[in-house]
């Protein structure tokens, strides 16, 4: 488990970025606090006839740049501090991507693994009834996150529409929906595809040709699998190692993404894949590869192993895989980190495209969506990279400077703060 309080980390990162910016004390004070926190109690009738009361949250961190945007997490250990931190990070993520959004996040303390589909539906609808007054297509737009999925989003959207009597473009109140109810087809691989564009641009910045180069991917869920598939099939890279929570596999000649996925589905893990050597998650991180993509959990690159990282590019598909101490070590070693809230922003960017289509009624092809995503990710990468070069600071600090500057400007233009 993560030791530090998540919201304290978020505030520290903001304070660190402020050192490299011309930002007033009052603006910084404002940015250290969420604009709105909603806590709700949701009574849900369980299948056995009993009623269980769940606690839910919705945090709208900052709406200077537009409606707040962010996922809904269902987790037995959900805390308000985590939701606040993630809402702050969503604020910077939408700003670094230059999307017309602020940042938000929601959560419910529950264990979905122990709930039936009927119970989940009742909880989803109850949550929407509880937070109905603070969400809409123009104020706060939720999406799926930990243990929530397109089906749960469809129930939530339906409940919102039932209450609102379809008075606004209600498909646009929630993103990450099934395509049959206004969802976007390109959402499935959006996070990995967005990350692949940033890796391509990082390689250009380093003068590296990706064809034939090696990549190791920690985590083989949605993002890890699609990252392996895209980097090998579209960029000609060799995926030499992948892992999941039970361990990893290594093959210097390269692994086939689809075959490994089929093996994982059959056995429950990538481990023992035919023709590959079993390795630990720790060993995977320290392999001699060109690109390392931590795509699983937080805080895996720490001061203990940072010195042993040999990759030239670290692409953070996971949230917070590198600790601040490790950041410094990797920067000193000349390793280029593509920070999480830039690298994994493909998901929220395609969510934005879904929302635009729901509001306008204009639906795009997968090819059009990918071309627009490419353009957005490429511009965001160079905005951050150029700031990193100009200010001589690491990529994470540069991403914060770009993002916070944009939110700060919007706050000044609105007259919320005078300087």
UniProtKB/Swiss-Prot annotation:
Is Cytoplasm a UniProt keyword of this protein?
yes
Q: Which UniProt keywords apply?
A: Cytoplasm, NAD, NADP, Oxidoreductase
User: Which residues are noted in the entry as NAD(+)-binding?
Assistant: 219-225
Mind telling me which PROSITE patterns this protein's record contains?
A: GLFV_DEHYDROGENASE (PS00074)
Which molecular function term from Gene Ontology is one that the record holds?
A: glutamate dehydrogenase (NADP+) activity
Record note on pH: Optimum pH is 8.0.
Q: Which InterPro entries match?
A: Aminoacid_DH-like_N_sf (IPR046346), GLPV_dehydrogenases (IPR053388), Glu/Leu/Phe/Val/Trp_DH (IPR006095), Glu/Leu/Phe/Val/Trp_DH_C (IPR006096), Glu/Leu/Phe/Val/Trp_DH_dimer (IPR006097), Glu/Leu/Phe/Val_DH_AS (IPR033524), Glu_DH (IPR014362), NAD(P)-bd_dom_sf (IPR036291)
Q: What does the annotation record about activity and temperature?
A: Optimum temperature is above 95 degrees Celsius.
Identify one Pfam family in the record.
Answer: ELFV_dehydrog_N
Biological process terms in GO annotation: glutamate catabolic process
Active site as annotated: 105
Instruction: Give Gene Ontology CC terms.
Output: cytoplasm
Instruction: Report which reactions are catalysed by this protein.
Output: L-glutamate + NAD(+) + H2O = 2-oxoglutarate + NH4(+) + NADH + H(+); L-glutamate + NADP(+) + H2O = 2-oxoglutarate + NH4(+) + NADPH + H(+)
Q: What is its EC number?
A: 1.4.1.3
User: What are the subcellular locations of this protein?
Assistant: Cytoplasm
Principal location listed in the UniProt entry: cytoplasm
Q: How does it assemble?
A: Homohexamer.
What family is this protein classified in? Answer: Belongs to the Glu/Leu/Phe/Val dehydrogenases family.
UniProt name for this protein? Glutamate dehydrogenase
Which species is this UniProt entry from?
Answer: Thermococcus litoralis (strain ATCC 51850 / DSM 5473 / JCM 8560 / NS-C)
